[in-house]
């Protein structure tokens, strides 16, 4: 079975990701909320998307913006009530929009009742629901030494000492995010019922599965190899990403999901897998295997980041980006697998600043080119709030303004290990300016109104605004301008539906002139069509050659209104899609 012969709604859908804290504040407290999302569903419908993915709205102490969950079955009061959530789901469904929610079950919050019980005593029945270990020993000052040398993603040790029982618990993310022990079957069943079952019973249409490759840890939790001898804690991902039982767990959870929905209802699951090889990806997303519908790969959004330290930039070429992006979908060729296409999410900066040009001259046209690229690729398209406006990164923020725990945690670790004035710190700030997670988390600009672009009435937002709303980069201005990035995205999504046979399901992807450092070109096929796509990733007029001089080329979409499809010269940041005959 090949991908073209197995159409599904979730393959053809475009999913619009919403970050609740930053979308729309309905009660003027400076935080977005679920009622705010409901109030703007007509805007989402106008764009032409098929589903929304709503980031965590569950009860949480907000150490990591809701990815530290204290109660899977309750809405965080600042976001509203459970009834507000049920109404949001109902109103979305009335508009033909499906609702995907976040499933954050590698870890929970230390405020979750399960962890409180586990923490209370070594004899507690839930003790084994988390990873508790005694100190490896004590240093010369009598301080307990962590059980292994794993480094947390947010800096420092992945272990936190708990005075009450004299043991450490594992947290590969923030200090207050203890990892679940998925080896414990009772724990798994409780997770499924509370996080998956509850929301399926309340009519959600699927899940985005957070860090879905990390549930299975290698037995014994061994020390990681020392790859950076200048720091005490090392990258331990080989011991907890794509672990020995991970596929068993996903099959079990998939079967549980099927048991919770009416016959005939097909839910959507997308896993944040991140890294791995093609064989891993195929097992996760094969229809026959029954684990996930699709997955997110991080390779293309990580280009230019030092693998040993995210907040340290390294040079990359357009070829590097092409190859990395293609990893998102090449593994599904001639399989029953599926995947995703995205450039932005809540953990990424703005794509026009990262991969296009956010200069006033080229921001709009390069945003449109990136939209053309996204809709031309095979896989399910995901758009992040503000991307449809061509939002750029914010400018010139001090560390005191940064809210992201990854950024502040890395800053604290570098300050401790290297010093405030070190070369390492200088590189950190260079990287933070480009790739801070906060770039995607600033409040959505609904208008040019001061002080907060219509996000709140007059309350100070929880995070500072992106100043670009004053430059016409806001929903109100773009909805009045038929040539805006918003309306270009709307048209692009219509074109994707009209040509879904080649744009959504096309296969046999082939790079053309892969080494070219200005042009991204490829062909792909259906059973009876062939497409040629060409994109100019530069601010120069650039000539290109077609792959087959004997064929005729009909341009059917592009990002320049005045483009001549017969010309073999692209304007700056131009993208074109051709059908061949």
Swiss-Prot record:
The record marks 347 as: Transition state stabilizer. The active site is at residues 210, 272. Its EC number is 3.2.1.10. The keyword Hydrolase applies. It holds the Pfam family Alpha-amylase. It catalyses: Hydrolysis of (1->6)-alpha-D-glucosidic linkages in some oligosaccharides produced from starch and glycogen by alpha-amylase, and in isomaltose. The keyword Hydrolase applies. Alpha-glucosidase with specificity for isomaltose, maltose, and palatinose. This is Oligo-1,6-glucosidase IMA5. It comes from Saccharomyces cerevisiae (strain ATCC 204508 / S288c).
